[in-house]
Amino acid sequence: MPGFDRISELPESLITQILLCLPTKDSVKTSVLSTRWKNLWLNVPGLDLTCSDFPFEDEEYEQVFINFIDRFLEFNPESRLQTFEVDYKRREIRGFKDRIGTAINRGIRLLDAVSSTMYWEEECIMYPYLEFMPLNLFTSKTLVTLKLRDSALNDPGLLSMPCLKFMILREVRWSGTMSLEKLVSGCPVLEDLTLVRTLICHIDDDELPVTRVRSRSLKTFYVPLAYGVGCRSRVPDKVLEIDAPGLENMTLKEDHFDGIVVKNLTSLFMIELNIKFAVDYRRSFDPEDLSKRNEIGDFLTGISRARHMIISQKTVKALESYSKVGSIPKFNNLSHLKAVFPSPLLPFLPAFLESFPNLKNLILKIAFAKDDETEELNLINVPRCIVSTLECVEIKGLFEWEEEEMKIARYFLENAAVLKKLTMSFIDYPRYASNSDVYEDLDKLTKRSQQCRIIVDDE
């Protein structure tokens, strides 16, 4: 029947679970639908609120914000909450820590709090401020997911979070004897950790010289891209130490630490690197720095059990510099590799592949630049993996079909004994050759593996 309201016939418990998927500002809007819907949003087992949901110019802004939260928490004080997500980064809101503590006592499974280290006065003057999390956070028996940004953590003494599996810490400040190592030690089932270290020093904290991640349960460790080209540290050099025998996936997409130490990564499956082993974007690896050489060598040895690897152009440059003064260890378990090679470093490719004797799948993206002064490309040495194990090669990032591109394709076709597929992927159509022309040129080349299939396509 047209206009028939079927949603209102659903049980209240199901409706509130549906509303839980919406930001609170949207679930509140349903209160005008009918008398039955008037207070349904107050029974939703979670809060998702941001300071931008309230008029910032209101003189009673902070009080309106906190009163709204109080009304929500007090409407059904005996009910259990599932989620508490609040972004309050504009101003200092007195008493907000107590509201987080109340939500924790209500049995929330997810806490997502975004604070700020700078607050605005009414005269538009900024001043530094740290919002400390309530101490009952560290003894929550129900939290499964914890997300904190720009928050501060004190040492609670007792720390036990028996259900916490997922933790995201972005620019968290550590106070006194509190540290990441201590926090992780109280999370016996932690599986997934994301860490963004603060590189800004307008507020002093008590970050230790070495940030340790020690966990037997941790399976995924992720340092995301957060600062981009402006990544540089204004605080003293710090070291990251990872000791996690159960770790399966590790991604380091940015240099947040000047030194990285890895221990006992016996279960490592996938590693993704976009680092150059120095925080400041203006600095690069110095081959004359003996301590840095040893650090990189130990790091590579520590991750050498990985089976899949993704490395960026930045990391390839660092490894090429390192290879002139040190030896890249063998990654005997590695079967899949995706690497971005700057075109001037293509001569380094055979020596680089020597470190992966059992490689089966290679995705090679070539980073061309108009101002690259590339020497004549001569790929002579043939590593073991090309002769014995390499089955699939995809070459990406191609713009043209000229002599250099032909040499790269010929290198794999003429030397790869068990190659099953070679894919040439062009960013744009070649200027002087169509895909069919490229295919014909490749098909004429000598193939060591007669079963190799050639594919030419566009990215």
From Swiss-Prot:
Family annotation (Pfam families): F-box (PF00646), FBD (PF08387), LRR_At5g56370 (PF24758)
Residue intervals of the FBD domain: 374-426
PROSITE patterns per the UniProt record, alphabetical: FBOX
CDD domains assigned to the protein according to its UniProt record, in alphabetical order: F-box_AtFBL13-like
InterPro entries: F-box-like_dom_sf (IPR036047), F-box_AtFBL13-like (IPR053781), F-box_dom (IPR001810), FBD (IPR006566), FBL13/AtMIF1-like (IPR050232), LRR_FXL15/At3g58940/PEG3-like (IPR055411)
Sequence ranges assigned to domain F-box in this UniProt record: 4-50
Protein name: FBD-associated F-box protein At5g27750
Species of provenance: Arabidopsis thaliana
